[in-house]
Amino acid sequence: MAIEYTTNNSSRFQSVVADQLIGFGLSVEPRQVITSSVVAARMVARAVPHGAKVLVVGAEHLREEIAWQGLEIVERAEDDPAAVVQGWYPDMTWNQLAQAAFAVERGAAYYVTNRDLTIPRELGIAPGCGSMVQAVVNATGVQPAACAGKPESAMYDEARLLAAADGAEPVRRELCLAIGDRLDTDIEAGNRGGYDSLAVLTGVTNPHELMLAPRHLRPTFIARDLRALNKPMPAPRREPDGRWVCGRCEAAIDAAGRLTVNDVTAMDALRAACCAAWEASDDGRALDADSLPDFDVIGAGE
């Protein structure tokens, strides 16, 4: 099974990300890491002629990826670039944003690595790439032609290409599984691209958020962590009386909109509960949010 690690981070080199993952006990090679800079550079290279000028606003990693694609990096709008590609890095200046805006106003195609509005730093939450992108959009009135990062599906599309052998067809979409802990990036990107997805509970998403997720943020599968990849996962099914059953667990919503389950410690119960809650939402039935079970699935490993 081929494994690719995708990240919206556009400033960290693949080797740096790989070293961090290795520190978690994983066996990872840098080529398995797909950053938003890798994806953005490949997008730009397909859109402009080989050797075309590209104005780059971003970290050294983004610049190296653009150069590796055979494109000429320029710094000023006066150099008449065919495209502008914008990422995030902490030393970005007003003049760099202005040059990007001037080039876009002159007709350069506009690409961005991601549109994350914020980025966590040691001292708190700081403006992310998306906030800087919005400055250029505000100045020009032009939206990016494409975004490399999630929740767009481009990163998963590129992963299919990069996982294939040289000259081979991309890995088929139906053979791919997008895995992540964020519904509004990892899972939404999978849904936008038509990929099956697995939401894990080892990060920011909790059971309540899963049960209340709107359609575009719902995963195909739910698990406590990645150990579930090596275990069978029963499919939830709807019974004629309206109950949802998954394995030995079940969930139901009564006439008052209260959701009940028979086991708050089992992942199968959470899977059934999500199906019951999602069905009620899609049918326009009221769901008593205060009645949502407080699942305790830490360590369930299912």
Descriptions of predicted regions:
Residues 1-39:
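Alpha-helical substrate-recognition element adjacent to the catalytic core
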Residues 18-31, 41, 45-302:
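Asp-based, Mg2+/Mn2+-dependent phosphohydrolase catalytic module
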